[in-house]
Amino acid sequence: MPKMKTKTAAAKRVRLTATGKVMHAGSGMRHNLEHKSARKRRALKRDDVLQTAQAKKMKGLLG
């Protein structure tokens, strides 16, 4: 049986940590940044951990 291919659309959006968590970039950092406080922009810059159910699906897509 051939190897499973990685879904490249999923690979572009998430990354796996060494401990197996699935990290993703949050929304809200594309435009209208001048109206957001510096504190808010710093908070939005960080990557977030996906919830358990979504992380399980994404790991399946990553192969």
Curated annotation (Swiss-Prot):
Residues 26-50 are annotated as: Disordered. The keyword Cell division does not apply. GO terms for biological process: translation. The keyword rRNA processing does not apply. InterPro entries: Ribosomal_bL35, Ribosomal_bL35-like, Ribosomal_bL35_CS, Ribosomal_bL35_sf. GO terms for cellular component: ribonucleoprotein complex; ribosome. Keywords: Ribonucleoprotein, Ribosomal protein. GO terms for molecular function: structural constituent of ribosome. It holds the Pfam family Ribosomal_L35p. Belongs to the bacterial ribosomal protein bL35 family. This is Large ribosomal subunit protein bL35. It comes from Bifidobacterium animalis subsp. lactis (strain AD011).
